[in-house]
Amino acid sequence: DLLLYRKLFLSRSDKFEDQYEGTFSEPTFEEIRKLSINNPAFLDYYKSHRENVVISSWHINEYESFAMWQIFTQKSEGLAIQSTVGRIQEALHLDKTFEQHIGEVNYIDYKKEYIPFDNTFFPFLFKRKSFQYEREIRIITDVTSFDLKIDNGLKIDVDINQLIEKIYIHPKSENWYKNLVIELVQRLGFDFKIEKSDLESDILI
């Protein structure tokens, strides 16, 4: 879909599997609750805000992650895009409608640690420590001011050639799948480097 339509999908934050997505830790929630005693709209805003924030999640790492292949792909078919923060920033300049923000996720203890709320993006840059393996960096867009009805997410224009540095193919994929990906990419007029993941390369013993 990304290659065919040259648009990047950002998922509505409250549709993520993690029910804590975009919420506050206990210490922060207690402070917000006190502040909202005389102003209920203050708390209501944060509850509804999640519906207007969309996110694209990326894994930041020097090396491939076997766990990420296992969790986010089905069977032996799937692709991983290699990029850099700089390339992502440049690629997003193509979209003139929405403003995107890029930030690295912090992993904290939601029962003990505090999440700042002086910026409306902060709740979306924190997750529970049990998600540390994701090493996530995010593209975040707030569409509140656009008065849009978003179902599952939003597609934004993106410079594909700038975004994608290399494509990795699932380590357990068959040759026919690799050839199919190469043919599709060529037909669409792209010349990305395409490699099969070496996580399943031949052992040396």
Label the model's feature ranges.
Residues 1-205:
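Partner-binding and oligomerization surfaces adjacent to conserved cores of proteins
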